[in-house]
C-alpha cells in the first residue's frame, strides 16, 4: 500500500514516542523530525532510524515539504508556538495534527468523534493526554443519559512529563475541561492534572466523576462503559478499568489505569502512549481518505 509521508515537529517525549508508532504504521511514513536542540535525544534517535532531521525549528522543514511530498505534520511542541507552526505547514497544503493544548482546530477523541471530522479540515487537535484517557468515559455516560457535570482527574508520573507539557499546565486544564463538554457531552466540565514524583514512577491513573441529571440507569451505563473501554483498547491495549462504574446517588465514578507500550519511555508513561496512539489513529483515518479509501477498509 502507498504510504502518506509525515513530518514530526518536536523531538521531546511525545514526538519521539510518536515516531516509533509511525514507524509501525502500514499507512503513514515518517520522513522528517524537527527540533530546536541539535543535541536532543529525539533527533539522535530519529537519525538512527533513517529519518531526516533539522534543529532549525519549523523553518528548517518548510523548504523540503513539497520535494519530500509531506501531507501530514504532527506538532508535539508547545501551545505557544503551535499557531505559527500550523499556519506555515497549512500554507503548503499540509494537514496539521496538533498534540499541544493550543486547540486551534476541532477536537478529536478517536472512539467518540473521529468519524465525524470533515476531510477538508487543515488542523485537528488531540486535546491532551488526560482528555484522551477520560473523555471516552464521559461520553460513555452521556450517550446513555444527560450529564450535568463531568470532572476528570489525571495523575501522571513526573518522569513522563517533559518541559513542554509543564509549560502548558494552564492550557491543559482549559483545553481538557472544554473538550469534556464539547466531545464528552457534559454540560459543565472540569479537569485537574496531578504530576506525581513518586519513585518508582506510577502508571497513569485517571478518575472520572459524572453527575447525571436524573437517576442513573446503572445497567445501561455499565454496559456503555465496558463497550467504550473495548474501543479504546483497540489502539491503547494498556487502557484498563480498575474500578467502577461506582454509583452514589446521581454521581457515577469510573477509575482507570493506562499502561504504555514502552515505545520510548517505560510502560509507566501511559499518558504518552494514549496521546501518541490517538494521534496516529487520527492521522491514519485522514491518510486513508487521501488515498481514496474508506476508513472501514482498514482497521489499523
Curated annotation (Swiss-Prot):
EC number(s) from the headed UniProt entry: 1.2.1.10
Active site: 129 (acyl-thioester intermediate)
GO terms, biological process: catabolic process
Pfam families on file: AcetDehyd-dimer
GO molecular function, one term: NAD binding
UniProt entry tagged with the keyword NAD: yes
InterPro entries assigned: Acetaldehyde_dehydrogenase, Acetylaldehyde_DH_C, NAD(P)-bd_dom_sf, Semialdehyde_DH_NAD-bd
Alphabetized Gene3D superfamilies for the sequence: Dihydrodipicolinate Reductase, domain 2, NAD(P)-binding Rossmann-like Domain
Catalytic activity line of the entry: acetaldehyde + NAD(+) + CoA = acetyl-CoA + NADH + H(+)
Chain positions recorded as NAD(+) binding sites: 11-14, 160-168, 271
Keywords: Aromatic hydrocarbons catabolism, NAD, Oxidoreductase
Superkingdom of this protein's organism: Bacteria
Keyword Cytoplasm: no
Family: Belongs to the acetaldehyde dehydrogenase family.
Listed name of the protein: Acetaldehyde dehydrogenase
Organism for this UniProt entry: Pseudoalteromonas translucida (strain TAC 125)
Source organism phylogeny: Bacteria, Pseudomonadati, Pseudomonadota, Gammaproteobacteria, Alteromonadales
